[in-house]
A protein has these predicted regions:
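...with weaker cross-activation on analogous glycine-rich loops/strands in unrelated enzymes
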Residues: 3-8, 59-137
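Positively charged, low-complexity intrinsically disordered regions
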Residues: 28, 70, 82, 146-149
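Low-complexity, Gly/Ser/Thr/Pro-rich intrinsically disordered linker/tail segments
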Residues: 144-161
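N-terminal capping segments
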Residues: 1-64, 157-160
Length: 161
C-alpha cells in the first residue's frame, strides 16, 4: 500500500472528531502534540495533517524525510522544500492542479486538508480537514469531509513513496 493511501485512510479514520472546548479536547491535543508548539487553544488544521502523516508513516515503515511538525498551513510548503525529493510541492497556476487521493491540499485562505479523491469534472476535490465545520470555515470545531474547488487551492504536496 502506498504512503499516500495510508495518509488518506488516517484522515478518514478521524472524521467525526469534535472539539470539547474551543480549539481543544483530548483528540485535538493528540493532533497538536505532533507539532513543535505546546498543546493549547490554537488553530489545528496543520496539526491534523501532521498527525495523519505521522500515523501513515507508522504503518508504512521507514521514510527518508523528516515528518512535518508545523502548526501553520502555509508553513507546510516550507517543510516540503526542506525534505528530500520523495515529497514534492506543486504550486497551482490559474486554477489548474493535479490532485490525487492522499495529497496534502493547501488553500489560499491559510487552511489545509487531505485529498480523498482526484478532481472531478467540475474541478472539485473531496477532502478531510481538521479545524473546520459543516460550512467549511478555516476555524471550526472538528474533522469534516469537505468538497472544495480547485480555484481555492494554493499548492499540493505529493508523496512519491
Amino acid at each position: 500500500m502506498t504512503l499516500r493511501e495510508l495518509i488518506a485512510q488516517a484522515a478518514e479514520a478521524e472524521v467525526g472528531v469534535r472539539e470539547t472546548k474551543t480549539n481543544g479536547g483530548k483528540r485535538i491535543a493528540d493532533y497538536q502534540s505532533c507539532t513543535w508548539l505546546p498543546v493549547g487553544a490554537w488553530p489545528w488544521c496543520a496539526a491534523f495533517v501532521d498527525f495523519c502523516v505521522k500515523s501513515a508513516v507508522e504503518k508504512f515503515g521507514p521514510v527518508t524525510f523528516a515528518l512535518p511538525r508545523t502548526a501553520g498551513a502555509w508553513d507546510l510548503e516550507n517543510w516540503c522544500r526542506s525534505v528530500d525529493d520523495t515529497v514534492k510541492l506543486k504550486k497551482t497556476k490559474q486554477g489548474i492542479a493535479t490532485v490525487q487521493r492522499g495529497d496534502i491540499v493547501i488553500y489560499k485562505f491559510s487552511h489545509v486538508g487531505i485529498a480523498t479523491s482526484s478532481l472531478d469534472d467540475d474541478g472539485d476535490v473531496s477532502t478531510i480537514e481538521g479545524n473546520t465545520n459543516s460550512a467549511g470555515s478555516r476555524e471550526g470545531d472538528g474533522v469534516y469531509r469537505r468538497t472544495r474547488n480547485v480555484s481555492q487551492i494554493r499548492s499540493i504536496i505529493k508523496f512519491t513513496q
